[in-house]
Amino acid sequence: MAHKKGTGSTRNGRDSNSKRLGVKAYGGEKVTAGSILIRQRGTSFLPGINVGKGKDDTLFALKEGTVSFESIKRNLRNRKRVNIVI
């Protein structure tokens, strides 16, 4: 007979790597063309003037300039739009 109870196994103990999402260039910051402005899942931020959207919804600068954010009201949900002011 065993004098110690055997240890059981657990179904926990895993975690995914962080995806480093979020704003990479804030309002008033100067950026160059091609700079990543926001990494996101879905469209929390919408692309505005001189801003492009990648296939993974990443927003990036199309031209050199200064980052500006604006709030827009759309379908009872406040959204934010990101622009590059030249």
Curated annotation (Swiss-Prot):
Keyword terms: Ribonucleoprotein, Ribosomal protein
SUPFAM superfamilies xref list: Ribosomal L27 protein-like
Record carries keyword Ribonucleoprotein: yes
GO cellular component: cytosolic large ribosomal subunit
PROSITE patterns: RIBOSOMAL_L27
Family according to the record: Belongs to the bacterial ribosomal protein bL27 family.
Protein name: Large ribosomal subunit protein bL27
Gene of this entry: rpmA
